[in-house]
Every structure is written in C-alpha cells, then in structure tokens.
Amino acid sequence: MIIKHFFGTVLVLLASTTIFSLDLKLIIFQQRQVNQESLKLLNKLQTLSIQQCLPHRKNFLLPQKSLSPQQYQKGHTLAILHEMLQQIFSLFRANISLDGWEENHTEKFLIQLHQQLEYLEALMGLEAEKLSGTLGSDNLRLQVKMYFRRIHDYLENQDYSTCAWAIVQVEISRCLFFVFSLTEKLSKQGRPLNDMKQELTTEFRSPR
C-alpha cells in the first residue's frame, strides 16, 4: 500500500511538472514574440535622427550586472521583468499624445507592453505554485524604479524636448533588449524534468 501510494505521488508530481514545463515554455515563447514586436514599434516612434541629439546623451546606469539572473531564483527574475515592463508602460502611457508621435504606433506599443505584462503575470502565477515566496524581490524592484526615476528626471530637466525623448527611446530599446536577454535566460532556469525524475527515483531507492 505504501509503495502504491508512493508511485501515485510520483506520477502526480511528474504530471504537474510536465504541465508546468509546457505552460512555461509556451508563455515564454509568447512573451519573446511580443517583445520583438515591441522593439519594432518603438523604432517606428523615433522621429529624429539620434546623431542630431548626441550632445544630449546621458548614461542612465541600467543596472544590468546587479540584476543578472544567474544569482537569483526564477521568481526574482520574473519580478525584475515585471517591474521593468511596468515602468516602460507607465512612461509611454503618460506621454501618449506627445507631439511628433503617431498615436496609432504609440497605442500599439502600449498594447504590446500590456500583453507582455499579462504573460509575465501568468508566469508569476505558475511560479507561485512552485515556490513559497520570492524574498529579496522588493530590493530588485527598487533598483529598477531608481533607474527609471533617473530617466524621468532627465526628461523633466530637458523640458521633455524632442532630443531628450530620442535619447530616452534609445535607452528604452536597450531595456527591451535586456528584457529579451532575461527572458532567454529565464527559459533556462529551473530544474529540468529529468532531474526531478532522478531525484524521485533516488528517494524511492534510498533505505529508511
């Protein structure tokens, strides 16, 4: 009876892990596709050659190293991605009617960002079923917020000029490439299904 119950538990665990793995891959694939579309739409928003605005360029100190996913759990990476996309969405939504921007392109860009946020929230929901919590994610989110605070301050100091926005759009493109990189690494995080099978088999064979 105990052995039967154990194998029943193993089958349930493997089935749920398989479903989770498939859902995760599907959502990450969708998020990756949407991110690529967002980059294309962002390029269409540029109304001024960046060469004209080089004197206004600024290093906003994108915290790529401190936000590297290798040192964090999957839940932390999801928190970073979610905060970055949320901040980008808020930045452009507040300036949707900016002179020189085609409103149609801006709206499409916001729709794509919103889709990414929905996919990430779905991922976070799946991950919540696997993890008890994501301690330390508040500090990571704070780093992202401080980075975007520097962008907001720059725009304000430059009176939201066309050149300032051109510089910021290039910076947001960097952000989206970073998001793309994080998404790629996210798909490689976590234990493979074969590792789970091996662990369960070892557990069954180990003497009590």
Curated annotation (Swiss-Prot):
It holds the Pfam family Interferon. GO terms for cellular component: extracellular space. Endometrium-specific. Glycans are attached at residues 95, 104. It is found in: Secreted. It comes from the Eukaryota. Residues 1-21 form the signal peptide. Its main location: secreted. Keywords: Antiviral defense, Cytokine, Disulfide bond, Glycoprotein, Secreted, Signal. Induction: By estrogens. InterPro entries: 4_helix_cytokine-like_core, Interferon_alpha/beta/delta. SUPFAM superfamilies: 4-helical cytokines. The keyword Repressor does not apply. One of its GO terms (biological process) is defense response to virus. SMART domains: IFabd (SM00076). Disulfide bonds join 53-163. The keyword 4Fe-4S does not apply. Type I interferon required for maintaining basal levels of IFN-regulated genes, including 2'-5'-oligoadenylate synthetase, IRF7 and ISG15, in the female reproductive tract. Directly mediates protection against viral and bacterial genital infections. Belongs to the alpha/beta interferon family. This is Interferon epsilon. It comes from Homo sapiens. The lineage of its organism: Eukaryota, Metazoa, Chordata, Craniata, Vertebrata.
